[in-house]
Amino acid sequence: MCGIVGVVSHSPVNQLIYDALLLLQHRGQDAAGIATNSGNKFSMHKANGLVRDVFRTRNMRSLMGNAGIGQVRYPTAGSSSAEEAQPFYVNAPFGITLAHNGNLTNVEQLKIEMFKNDRRHINTDSDSEVLLNVLAHEMQEATTGYSLDPTSLFKTVAALHKRVRGSYAVVAQIAGHGLLAFRDPFGIRPLCIGFNDTEKGQEYVIASESVALEGLGFRFLRDVIPGEAIFIDMDGKLYNQQCAENPTMNPCAFEFVYLARPDSIIDGASVYATRLKMGEYLADKIKREFSHGEIDVVMPIPDSSRPAAMELALKLNLEYREGFIKNRYIGRTFLMPGQAIRRKSVRQKLNAIGSEFKGKNVLLVDDSIVRGTTSREIVQMARDSGAKRVIFASAAPPVKFPNVYGIDMPTRNELIAYGRSDEEVCREITADALVYQDIEALKRSISDVNPMLKNFEASCFDGVYVTGDISRDYLDRLESVRNDAKPENDDAVRSQLNLNLAHVD
């Protein structure tokens, strides 16, 4: 999962992009990068770390230009080495930088095509570098001479759609020409546009979530629709065209469950409102399965589950209390690489308020249960604080299958619900009872907010992969690549190599 942003303005954009990345930091805490364009020259800085740590004053001063792109990354394909931080750059044709949110599912095939047919070398394991090279090749094929017009760019994206499979929301710069953005034909990963009126004309921001637009003082214009390409030239003129033959809207359901900020609007649906609906439908199920008096108090697991827990408590007429305090300086545990790190971080991240638990039958509400590491630790914390009985509720259905579209759910065996019944999962997390959201209720939670959304990418819950190209062999290969057993010092070795090369005079 990543957060991306692109800006075309009439004044320097370095601070705008930095601020946007801070607003998207929840989408990735592994690396950050910014590339700006002034005339025909790119300036770029990227590194591993949080936005506030990657960019210092000297870095910001070097990022000159009135257009630029940025990204915050959590790695889902390739490694987490600094050399794979984005944006990526290629010098021909014209000079292009690119930032990508998603995951390509036919990347190995594309690498072979790149080498044998397109004569292009891929230097990292990142699928984003592959995507950039496909874009560059198709742009070379679509243009003649030194000119570049919107028609050629839309032809480029149309050709890319025919070659590339998977999920991709993209912002790219073409040196001296402008900003290109596009979304895959299934609309899996979010992308939206905002604008601002100035004395010199309109300026635009394109970002993963609407919260980035609003936080910059831009007005939300609309979402980029599946398969669409948008080009904004350096004068701030916007062009758009549908570039896919059969686009369909299949937004990722997990964006609404966990990934997106609650104050964002994705594809016309308020994330906050969908989470309230999840709580409402979960309350209906709990009412059917538990009798009056079995639950004394409802508590959320901060922060994503809070809207669902509040609505659930309201509908069941139960007391709602905050039982855990979150340390906001600890990253999101689901997005932390390495199971051992996740387990250790839970108690550093959350601290129980003992008086809220003592002698009570507690219903704990979380947004989802993925690996079960966090859930198990939280149940134990509740017991240690004196809870009489601990019931655990998930606002999402059981996560039983890997996600191949840009979320780090690497192996089936790591998913606690894979191959287990609800009763077995309950025993694994040591709860007294467990309640999962039904998948149809989850989908209704989103459709109730925006009835235009009828189909979803919900493969981690139902095992249905909307792109239609995912086989068991593919999942086996993916698990091998993303396995947590990867040597811990691998990235350190690669980074050291890069550092040595960087100091060669």
Region annotations inferred by a language model:
Residues 161, 176-178, 183, 217-223, ...:
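PRPP-dependent phosphoribosyltransferase catalytic core
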Residues 202-209, 248-249, 333-347, 387, ...:
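Flexible glycine/proline-rich, aromatic-decorated loop/lid segments
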Residues 84, 135-140, 335-340, 406-407, ...:
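Short, surface-exposed amphipathic charged segments that create phosphate/polyanion-binding patches used
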Residues 12-14, 76-77, 106, 179, ...:
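Flexible loop/turn segments at secondary-structure boundaries
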Residues 298-301, 305-312, 316, 320, ...:
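Extended, hydrophobic alpha-helical segments in both membrane/secreted and soluble proteins
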Residues 1-226, 231-296, 301, 389:
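Conserved short alpha-helical segments that host acidic/polar catalytic motifs at enzyme active sites
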Residues 314-362, 373, 400-410:
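Short, glycine/charge-rich flexible loops or terminal/linker lids adjacent to PRPP-binding catalytic cores
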Residues 55, 129-134, 320-331, 428-446:
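A conserved beta-strand->alpha-helix junction
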